[in-house]
Amino acid sequence: MSTTAVFIPPQIMVTSNVEKVPISIITHSSDSNFIAYRLNNKLNIFDNKLNKLGELESGSQHTGIIRSIEFTKNNQSLITSSSDKFLKIWDTTNNFKNIKSINTNKKIICSILNKDDSEILVSDKCGDVFKYSLIDDSKNKIEVSGDKSAKHDEKESDKNLVFGHYSSIVDIKFSPCFNYLLSADRDEKIRVSHYPNCFDIESFCLGHTKYVTEILLVPGRDDLLISGSGDGTIKLWNWKQGKCLQTVDFNSKHENAITIPQVVFKVDATTTTNQLIFSIENSNNIYILPMNVEKGEFNQSELKTIPLTQSSPISIDLIDNGKTILASLLPTTKEVDVAIAFDSTTLSQQSDNKVVIAINSVDASTTLKPAELKSVLESIEKKQYRKHVSYSKQMMNSTDNKNKEDDDLSLDEQDIDDTTDINNNNKNKNQETIQDSRPLKLRKMTIEGDKEIQKELEEKESKKQEE
């Protein structure tokens, strides 16, 4: 077992090189009875008690890419969200029967359940977060007009809107006390908002130079947050203060590193050490970075790696009450499995793990059309985030003819809500005009931001009266 990372040439996810559809999301119930994962773009369940895969009604599956899978805290329900704009509730006590589907009319990126699992927050591709009741459907009604010119005003008055970012939100987490909401976006920042009054911002965690990939809260230290990024670093934060406590840089070990925090866990009750399991996109290693919880710092000298001979890891979860590391792989050949397991203490491979055997026994050969498979793979890759630009970057690009980065920063119309209308013919208009075209929902939702918006509206009204 090596204690230092070895550079392995990147394996680009090319559609023609993928022999099986990879598992892109893995999670488990807190009682360890169930493991849920996305395979072949469908929800799959492994029942630990019965030691077998569950069978879901074929007609109840999502029609789009599943974006999130989360068990309720009492483990009686499973909530999934999808790019098909639906939330689905599955009854874990009744063979995972789909008991409710909620049409959000939003292209969902990620979601999180509230404290009592009565509501779910979802972020859409425009950087907005909306709240939906899982109990009272009357709270989820949204009036939609057929008049496209009224779309922006519609979304402004959407009673489900909680808050918004300038750019797409890639991850959201509640603080352990559920009084704060932490949101990370493609514009390199992490925002800490009071909840439910999210316009009241506690702090910003600023320091990443590229998009944030994932954020994780630290068990045993409610004040600490871990983040990964396209800048190749792992950062440790005091999130309430917005203070970066430590940065671990992996660019010297991996070219164009993209770090993805996967799981952070406490080794046992008698130690002050936590372990962060993370991956680096296109690297054939699983990394384990020890962390001293009391001191609030990573121990870089004790970095461990689990080399994978078959493929790079995609999604990683800790199962069997913390005893097993379960990872999904990118199968570039028919011989490569879709899942692999390791002992979390010895880091030795568990070839006889019952979950892995069951998952790998399913025919995962791709049956998706090339375009569908491409969409699935793009939803896995974290570097997809650099393909999308926020309204703030759109504003800068339109007033500067210089090349800002590369073509990946151009707006992808599929990833901007259908109700958002940006006319490419307006590139030569001045900054004020472009700023006015931005929906208010994407403006900085602070008390100061609210004042700025009110001032702009007053100026507009004054100009109209003068005319």
From Swiss-Prot:
The keyword Repeat applies. Gene3D superfamilies: YVTN repeat-like/Quinoprotein amine dehydrogenase (2.130.10.10). SUPFAM superfamilies: WD40 repeat-like (SSF50978). It holds the Pfam family WD40. Disulfide bonds: none annotated. Required for the formation of N(7)-methylguanine at position 46 (m7G46) in tRNA. In the complex, it is required to stabilize and induce conformational changes of the catalytic subunit. Keywords: Nucleus, Repeat, tRNA processing, WD repeat. Residues 445-467 have a biased composition (Basic and acidic residues). Belongs to the WD repeat TRM82 family. Pathway: tRNA modification; N(7)-methylguanine-tRNA biosynthesis. HAMAP family: TRM82. It comes from Dictyostelium discoideum. Forms a heterodimer with the catalytic subunit mettl1. Residues 421-434 have a biased composition (Low complexity). It is found in: Nucleus. GO terms for cellular component: cytosol; nucleus; tRNA methyltransferase complex. InterPro entries: Trm82, WD40/YVTN_repeat-like_dom_sf, WD40_repeat_dom_sf, WD40_rpt. WD repeats lie at residues 61-100, 164-203, 207-249. Its main location: nucleus. This is tRNA (guanine-N(7)-)-methyltransferase non-catalytic subunit wdr4. Residues 415-467 are annotated as: Disordered. GO terms for biological process: tRNA (guanine-N7)-methylation; tRNA modification.
